[in-house]
Amino acid sequence: MEARGKVVGVIGNLVTIEIVGTVSMNEIVFIKTGGRSLKAEIIRIRDGEVDAQVFEMTKGIAVGDDIEFTDKLLTVELGPGLLSQVYDGLQNPLSELAAQCGFFLERGLYLSALDRSKKWSFNATAKVGDIVVAGDYLGFVVEGTIKHKIMVPFYRKDSYKIVEIVSDGNYTVDDKIAVIENDAGGRHVITMSFHWPVKVPITSYKDRLIPSEPMVTQTRIIDTFFPVAKGGTFCIPGPFGAGKTVLQQVTSRNADVDVVIIAACGERAGEVVETLKEFPELIDPRTGKSLMDRTCIICNTSSMPVAAREASVYTAITIGEYYRQMGLDILLLADSTSRWAQAMREMSGRLEEIPGEEAFPAYLESVIASFYERAGIVVLNDGNVGSVTVGGSVSPAGGNFEEPVTQATLKVVGAFHGLTRERSDARKFPAINPLESWSKYRGVVESEKTGYARSFLAKGNEINQMMKVVGEEGISIGDFLVYLKSELLDACYLQQNSFDSVDTAVSPERQNYMFDILYDILQSDFKFENKLEARSFVNELRQNILDMNLNPFKEEKFNKLENTLKDLVRSKKLDF
């Protein structure tokens, strides 16, 4: 029986609907009001009534308004043309919305995610008679710098035989590419695009692997001390202004991945505008073209309706999984998951659910876990490997890492890059705290060496705290030297200049080379007459290494500075 319904109550963006017939959880409905149809999603079903969250402002919705049921879940359209686009959480292209509406978006306006008129040069790789299943490749088109594979839609569960496939040529996303037939004789037309529900993970692959290969970000403190694996997860919690967004932008520019997807969910409009302005101007170091050519941005600012924040996170991860199915490495950056959690708290309050800690819903942990679990590295049907690496920034109030969203995130991620106000105020960027952060993954430098260096940093911090109480005079010259060496490691290796053309991106080879130099200094014993001499010597070392960081690796000036450094170390080193 086809469902019918009418509005019986409105609280904020939660609408209560009286229904006749059957409906399903998470079904999309349209509320007819004032000549417009507003999109909403059913989030609770009760006897004879359902509650739906509206993805638009609910102004004007009245008791008695009619409801149109779609019998479909919230979906995204997948196909060539997603890259270099900027979408809202419902996959409306913002550039086209702006062209139609101007600065202020109209309610009830939903546009096609893909350009229906653009023709793509299709190259067939399958042939008539081939047996295919969901996720198998039929051909490819060139999208920017990648080969965009045209696949059998993931919702096709049977084994099919190709009975017709077009010759190489130019086609739109709606043109027929192939016809497949199942064992029962049922035929299906394949086009370049299809829809997939955002809350359902894509599972058209052979096997799931344990992440092990490092995703090189070319940021020293991450790759060496707190690495992220391809297909792994990491979080970047930190207070406002600590550099979360800049760190994510640097990572997206230099990371060893094929496609970057940015979900700006609930960030301040100014920050989102900054991202939208800067990204087209950023040059991809690998191709020399705009970084936008391999980037897709899903943005929902804090001024947009809260329900669309949740949609934007799921839309982004689904697009990421789609490109993973092509054997590509994907990096998804969610900024910030705290705003998404706040949207859940708002809806939970309106549903009158029993609140958990700080009024967040009791199921907060399981929802956050289900999002991060969609990251991973998989073996595809053809034996190739694809990965989705997920990094979420968290904005805890006052930088308090004990709050529920940060704690729920820490339980499921593989690396924790904790930014602190203390380091950002001291202008130590990236402001990742080396004593609080951690990672479960393998890095580009041997773990024994990094473990030794971290213990050195901890000792240096203890001595620094002691010096704040008793002063420099109250500690031995040996302890003072440990403190100076830890400061040297911090200044020359943990800190990095994102605005310098050389220091912004450091290759794994260079990281190993520079770390070995510093490791040797940490392990060496030096002889000094007094603390002033020790400080002067370490400052000289620091300036020399900082100059090396700003010069191209193993070129003439770099080699000259290295020789000077070796002579300096040799002059004060104790021989045994």
Swiss-Prot record:
Q: Which GO terms describe its biological process?
A: proton motive force-driven plasma membrane ATP synthesis
Gene Ontology MF annotations: ATP binding; proton-transporting ATP synthase activity, rotational mechanism; proton-transporting ATPase activity, rotational mechanism
- The answer to whether keyword rRNA-binding applies is no
Gene3D superfamilies linked to this entry = 2.40.30.20, 2.40.50.100, Bovine Mitochondrial F1-atpase, Atp Synthase Beta Chain, Chain D, domain 3, P-loop containing nucleotide triphosphate hydrolases
Q: Which UniProt keywords apply?
A: ATP synthesis, ATP-binding, Hydrogen ion transport, Ion transport, Nucleotide-binding, Translocase, Transport
Entries under InterPro entries matching the protein: ATP-synt_VA_C, ATP-synth_a_Xtn, ATP_synth_asu-like_sf, ATPase_a/bsu_AS, ATPase_F1/V1/A1_a/bsu_N, ATPase_F1/V1/A1_a/bsu_nucl-bd, ATPase_F1/V1_b/a_C, P-loop_NTPase
Q: Which PROSITE patterns would you find in this protein's record?
A: ATPASE_ALPHA_BETA
Top-rank taxon of the source lineage equals Bacteria
E.C. no: 7.1.2.2
Name the residues that bind ATP.
G238, P239, F240, G241, A242, G243, K244, T245
Q: Does the keyword NADP apply?
A: no
Query: Which cysteines bridge via disulfide bonds?
Result: none
Q: According to its UniProt record, which reaction does this protein catalyse?
A: ATP + H2O + 4 H(+)(in) = ADP + phosphate + 5 H(+)(out)
Q: So what family is this one in?
A: Belongs to the ATPase alpha/beta chains family.
Q: Which NCBIfam families match?
A: PRK04192.1
Biological role = Produces ATP from ADP in the presence of a proton gradient across the membrane. The V-type alpha chain is a catalytic subunit.
Supply the name of the protein: V-type ATP synthase alpha chain
